[in-house]
């Protein structure tokens, strides 16, 4: 995968998307193959993994902790390891206004906003966003999409998954499609649109699943 691109990882339920993400994050060790960042293996390399920002599908935090305390704790943990801070989303989402609220009182959408802020907080080189728009209101979705595009323009590598493919239309540069843990193809979205005759990502993927011959599925380096 190349820097300055946003890859949408797509596949049917059970295709291996979550497992792939867990391998990137180090919570699952792959049976074979090597995951590298800038030519270095991610295996047993916490310093390298610290350059990855992660937004989980469901953020789980201590219920009795206040929002402000959560960010204070994270900053203390990373003190001395990462000097850069990116608080654009914290400002855009108005996190300071809910700093004194406990995590247990937050709605699902507000938890998602907190998770998004944490993913970007330490200005990572790689962003892994798992169902990032789930539960967000329309305004928050647009704020997050704009942030993703801005970070991509800065040369960051972004990996996204979502069952709401319409949310990925504007921010996807490349599509990685997997089935049963195997890579079917990795292609620039504009190439797929030209070959498949569909502009909308959801319709394009549906067409590919119905008729794999509608586009070239030859594998290209991801």
Features from the language model and the residues they span:
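Conserved ABC ATPase "signature" region
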Residues: 72, 83-98
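Conserved ABC ATPase signature
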Residues: 102-109
